[in-house]
Amino acid sequence: NVLDIYMDCPSRERAGWLFDSYYTAKAEYGLTDKSVVEKAFLENYIKGGNLKNHIGMVSMCYPADVFSGSFVPQWSLWYIYEIYEYVTERHGEIEKEMFRTQVCGIFDYFKDFENEYELLERLDGWNFVEWSKLNDRVFDVSWPTNMLYAAALDRAAELFGISDYAEKSKRLKQTICDMAYNGVIFADRAVRNKNGELVTTDEVSQTAQYYALKFKTVPEGDERFERLKDIILKDRESEFERFGEVEPADVLPGMYIKMELLLKWGAYDRLKQEIKRYFLCMARQTSTLWERKNGKCSLDHGFASYICVLIKRICGE
């Protein structure tokens, strides 16, 4: 899946996609202790990744972008997350200041989509939260998208010392907790009613909870965080069903976020259980790992190499 840049699937998608790169970069560094390909990937984005028709926004994949000119607004936020980890965790060779203008441009772009609560509402482009019903729950306000937005602001604030970003992130997280949290779990979205009021729906999913935990919508140690963490650690997510039908997580990105969390928490037995549950059948069928658990997309996907890093960590390497 790698020649000169990260590719999703060499037989189908010879393009460097954002978001996928977030996990493929972790795999490169985890397997080689280097970020050679990631450096080339990020340099491409610095030099030519900005869209001409949507000032401030970056391409969803570059080079070899799609002819339609469409873009995934959420991927620009994952890009900021990748930049943060490249600089702070992988100690990449590209100086962080090389990213400043582009990162600030992304946030300037999003200002036009902020509503009266500073929440992102009805974003342009191909809104992508997960390969599941969550992708049908992006309007009017996607709570997972706003969790990601708040976290990206926080990362940029830390990276570049921009206090306004940190303050906005804090306000957004509080708003999300006030509007999306029902006392146990977070909802998937809010919609405008006939009076124009923003009302949170009763639609819920596993992945929205993973977003809330990864992006620290509630801080670690907070009772709400610990309650969700305990449910996931003890494999008791069926408890969410008392709030109605719960959309299960798919591989991209729900399962990866969940596995990241289990790794961070040192829950290696649970992590091993999840890897076997979702990926062993893929390996047995095709000797590769897939983009989606139903096998309808790529059956040899680059970001799936992150599983190797998880297995190494389980084995103590």
Please report, for each region that a protein language model flagged, where it lies by residue:
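Active-site core of glycosidic bond-cleaving carbohydrate-active enzymes
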Residues: 16-317
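Mature extracytoplasmic enzyme cores
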Residues: 1-5
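Phosphate-binding glycine-rich loops and their immediate beta-loop-alpha structural context
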Residues: 13
